[in-house]
């Protein structure tokens, strides 16, 4: 039995791992799917004071409260920022880091700072400009969800994803991640690329880490929300790490 902590991405909640978590539990694993402050069932806690640090502490608190060790820590999309921060602080408790079509930051990076590295200039500028405009004009500091259609989520689950995603604090994307270097102690890292949608910033990270010591890069033929599109296949891949 392995201990899995599945960390969701922007606008989502722990709900997005429903089917993957069920498959892992059926196989006998312990699975936690924490929801970040300000989204999902915790949307009532949203506000401009919610930052990347808030979400890192959410996951740290979950692991510490459940007294978990030897954790396989999975982060989807924006969740890659979160799990990197978590691993930096409690690396001895982490067996593996899994970046699920996710950002892989280094010291000082914010998500907004990573977009120009991972996308063509005109595309990254459009993303960043659109995010700021929506946050300022519509919901005062909250970034609006990107529709599931643009992430090529499987058609019969798009409505489910769209109705459950909620705006997220812009500050979570703008806060630089400050690292002390502790995460380097985690020796097993996996990058899972969702190879069925574009324009994807995550091809940049898959290419960057492919072939590097300690990294395994695999591709899934689906849209960005791998845990929604291919939940059982994802569970099988994750279970193999246990």
UniProtKB/Swiss-Prot annotation:
The keyword Secreted appears for this protein: yes
EC id: 3.1.1.122
Main enzyme class: hydrolase
InterPro entries: AB_hydrolase_1, AB_hydrolase_fold, Sec-Metab_Biosynth_Hydrolase
Reactions accelerated catalytically: carbendazim + H2O = 2-aminobenzimidazole + methanol + CO2; carbendazim + H2O = N-(1H-1,3-benzodiazol-2-yl)carbamate + methanol + H(+); N-(1H-1,3-benzodiazol-2-yl)carbamate + H(+) = 2-aminobenzimidazole + CO2
A single cellular component GO annotation: extracellular region
Keywords, alphabetical: Hydrolase, Secreted
Active-site residues per Swiss-Prot or TrEMBL entry: 77
Pfam family, one: Abhydrolase_6
Coiled-coil region: none
GO molecular function, one term: hydrolase activity
PANTHER family: AB HYDROLASE-1 DOMAIN-CONTAINING PROTEIN-RELATED (PTHR37017), ESTERASE_LIPASE_THIOESTERASE DOMAIN-CONTAINING PROTEIN (PTHR37017:SF11)
Described purpose of this protein according to its UniProt entry: Catalyzes the hydrolysis of the fungicide carbendazim (methyl-1H-benzimidazol-2-ylcarbamate or MBC) to 2-aminobenzimidazole (2-AB). Following hydrolysis of the carbamate ester, the carbamate decarboxylates spontaneously. Can hydrolyze model carboxylesters such as methyl salicylate, alpha-naphthyl acetate and p-nitrophenyl acetate. In addition, shows substantial hydrolytic activity in vitro against widespread pollutants with carboxylester, carbamate and amide linkages, such as dimethyl phthalate, propanil and chlorpropham.
Family per record: Belongs to the AB hydrolase superfamily.
Protein name listed in UniProt: Carbendazim hydrolyzing esterase
Originating organism: Nocardioides sp. (strain SG-4G)
